[in-house]
Design a protein with these regions (language model features):
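Intrinsically disordered, low-complexity repeat regions enriched in Pro/Gln/Gly/Tyr
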Residues: 212-265
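Intrinsically disordered, compositionally biased charged tails
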Residues: 1-2, 244
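Composition-driven recognition of glycine/serine/threonine/acidic- and proline-rich low-complexity segments
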Residues: 3-14, 18-233
Length: 265
């Protein structure tokens, strides 16, 4: 019996993420959501701030016990570059506020019942937000990433829900990434992203591999040059540095949404 339990424990550890992988997932989510925040700002014309993510492990019972009821589950499936899906969870009121703002309202029309119009609007918002996040992910993984149109559903966690019908990975343990989201003075709330653990590992491995390739490229570029190639290499080096400077500037602007900088509302 002891041997079996030890084996189970080892198997469980293999299924979970290491601390390094959790950090990597947090950084991936941070950059992706930063890009998504910029897109949401353009849709609602209000200041959008999304906080640094908190990465943890969770299961369906934890979600039912801790999150507001009812809520909206938005499934994002990857069609190119990654194999899998993740789920974004928003509170019902937040969906109503975003939908009202998208339709030209002031964000206070939240009394009516959540219906197909809200779900259609939030699906379109998430299509644009997660599409821009996929573009950021493409840069991090150095390959094309694409998604299918997100599908939004109302889920009342007070009722008995077959989580397997929402997505099979919800029947076991999964990665939960929590963000604080602020939209002007209308929303100060928590949103969640739920990832299957194998999918999270795949993203981490992709980022690590891309970083290794970048490191090898830098090492090759930094090798000493001798002979008559010195002058030519000096010219090449100075021109090669220009894109790097541009990339740094792009990185700085890319970080702005994470800090809530796109403030024109």
């Amino acid at each position: 019996l002891n041997d079996d339990s030890g084996s189970d424990s080892s198997d469980k550890n293999d299924r979970l993420l290491t601390d390094e992988e959790k950090d990597a997932i947090g950084e991936i989510a941070n950059i992706s959501m930063g890009t998504a925040a910029t897109t949401l700002f353009s849709l609602v014309n209000r200041r959008v701030e999304i906080s640094t993510p908190v990465v943890s492990f969770s299961n369906w019972d934890d979600i039912v016990a801790s999150y507001e009821k009812p809520c909206v589950f938005i499934k994002i499936a990857y069609t190119v570059g990654l194999d899998g899906s993740n789920i974004l969870v928003l509170k019902e009121r937040d969906v109503k506020v975003i939908t009202d703002l998208m339709m030209g309202g002031d964000g206070t029309n939240t009394d009516e019942e959540l219906g197909e119009l809200h779900l259609s609007a939030i699906s379109e918002a998430m299509n644009q937000m997660m599409g821009s996040a996929a573009t950021s992910l493409s840069s991090m993984l150095n390959k094309t990433i694409d998604i299918s149109p997100p599908v939004a559903d109302i889920v009342d966690l007070k009722e008995t829900v077959d989580e397997g019908q929402i997505d099979e990975f919800l029947t076991g343990e999964f990665v939960k990434i929590s963000f604080r989201m602020e939209i002007g003075d209308l929303v100060d709330s928590e949103i969640m992203q739920l990832y299957p653990i194998p999918f999270a590992k795949e993203m981490c491995q992709g980022v690590s591999k891309n970083m290794e390739l970048d490191s090898e490229s830098i090492t090759e570029d930094s090798k000493p040059i001798s002979g008559n190639n010195a002058a030519a290499s000096q010219t090449n080096t100075s021109s090669a540095q220009q894109p790097n400077m541009g990339a740094m500037n792009m990185g700085q602007s890319g970080q702005q949404p994470m800090m809530g900088q796109p403030m024109m509302g």
